[in-house]
């Protein structure tokens, strides 16, 4: 519980810390039967390809977790699970309270049938997703994709076994607001998106955002083919209030040519100017110095659908 020290600045955070402590206590959760504990299973196993066809690349297993009072406030996890199932990704949704038990089961399943592991959680479920990844790390297993959606403030740092991490949060929110960092030495793809300037986005509807859900489904579908050249650079954004919510995977370094400016680089890489300015403080000169390094956000694979500017209504 060392990561709770100094974090309990208000009653809401104290409650979140207590929930986290109960969640990761060795008992009684380790003995729970998920059939009794009540995860709502929305998935079925994906159908096997015809015998005459070559085996498809493994598309992974997705484990999704609701937050506190999840059946009331985290229903977006259920709809996201259904969307993953509809495109052939085995996916289950659970209450965060049985997270350790599900992680133990996932480890056993992986030993029998290795497949990419995807972890997605909302609120306390976001904390669960990161702790789940820590359990995998202890067993020498990688997590292909971890997504935290407005996770609890007490969420720990991202462990080194995570290939891709995305944090979508509301910095000023007392129910979530977890600004999750990665551990020193992290070499995976890291992207953090603060939506606090989007007034229409709340803790209780952020996981229901159709634009966010569609992009996450795309990222899961592209796990087998997503590649990137060069070392990934972490990116952290405060998304402007009227900007579409676009979930890049990480950043990459490009080098200015004679006559280049922030505007010309943004146009060349098809990204909004604000995304270049935020990641390159102090480099707003025009023109840039030839050879100057500029960090540009990127997708590991082109989005399967265009990112829309639609935002969720208050629900």
What name fits each language-model region?
Residues 236-253, 297-315:
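Intrinsically disordered, low-complexity Ser/Thr-rich linker and spacer segments
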Residues 26-41:
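Signal peptide processing junction and immediate N-terminal pro/mature segment
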């Amino acid at each position: 519980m060392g990561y709770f020290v100094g974090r309990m600045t208000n009653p809401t955070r104290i409650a979140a810390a207590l929930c986290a402590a109960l969640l990761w206590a060795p008992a009684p959760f380790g003995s729970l039967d998920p059939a009794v504990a009540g995860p709502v299973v929305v998935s079925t196993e994906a159908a096997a390809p015809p015998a005459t066809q070559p085996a498809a690349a493994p598309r992974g297993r997705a484990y999704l977790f609701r937050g506190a009072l999840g059946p009331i406030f985290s229903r977006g996890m259920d709809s996201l699970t259904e969307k993953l199932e509809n495109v052939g990704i085995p996916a289950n949704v659970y209450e965060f309270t049985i997270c350790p038990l599900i992680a133990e089961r996932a480890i056993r399943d992986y030993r029998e049938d290795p497949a990419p592991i995807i972890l997605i959680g909302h609120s306390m479920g976001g904390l669960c997703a990161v702790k789940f990844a820590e359990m995998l790390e202890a067993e020498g297993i990688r997590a292909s994709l971890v997504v935290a959606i407005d996770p609890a403030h007490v969420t720990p740092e991202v462990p080194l076994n995570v290939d891709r991490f995305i944090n979508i949060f509301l910095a000023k929110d007392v129910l979530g607001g977890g600004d999750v960092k990665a551990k020193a030495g992290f070499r995976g793809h890291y992207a953090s998106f603060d939506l606090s300037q989007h007034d229409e986005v709340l803790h209780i509807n952020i996981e229901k955002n159709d634009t966010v859900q569609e992009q996450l489904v795309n990222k899961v579908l592209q796990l087998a083919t997503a590649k990137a050249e060069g070392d990934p650079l972490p990116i952290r954004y405060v998304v402007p209030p009227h900007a579409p919510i676009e979930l890049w995977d990480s950043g990459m370094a490009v080098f200015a040519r004679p006559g280049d400016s922030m505007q010309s680089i943004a146009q060349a890489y098809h990204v909004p100017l604000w995304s270049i300015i935020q990641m390159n403080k102090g480099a707003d000169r025009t023109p840039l110095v030839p050879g100057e390094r500029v960090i540009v956000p990127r997708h590991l694979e082109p989005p399967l659908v265009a990112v829309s500017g639609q935002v969720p209504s208050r629900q």
